[in-house]
Amino acid sequence: MAGGTRAFTAVLTRPDGQSGALASQLAEAGCDVLEFPLIDIAPVDDPAPLDAAFAALADYALVIFVSPNAIDRALAQYGAIWPNALPVGVVGPGSVAALERHGIAAPAHRVIAPQAPAD
């Protein structure tokens, strides 16, 4: 907004380094933007519980991931090809894209995701 007062300030609380595109779009739309990360994405302190869960994947009917960050961290630790017979549930299109980056996508895998964007 050249020469004018900005309408409002948007506070972006996404993890550090993950709000750049949104910040740019908001600034172009005339908003002041304050990036204020409230979540720090880091490796788990004790990988044993996740390793145990991965070792038991054959016992599960479904695995659900709650975010692209969860997918990236978990699958980096898993380090193997995801079993084709094990469906994966996710909450939004960003998570679907994260699964695809890790080679988990239809038709080889069943990915369960809502049709409407997550709130």
Predicted regions, residues:
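Conserved beta-alpha
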Residues: 1-119
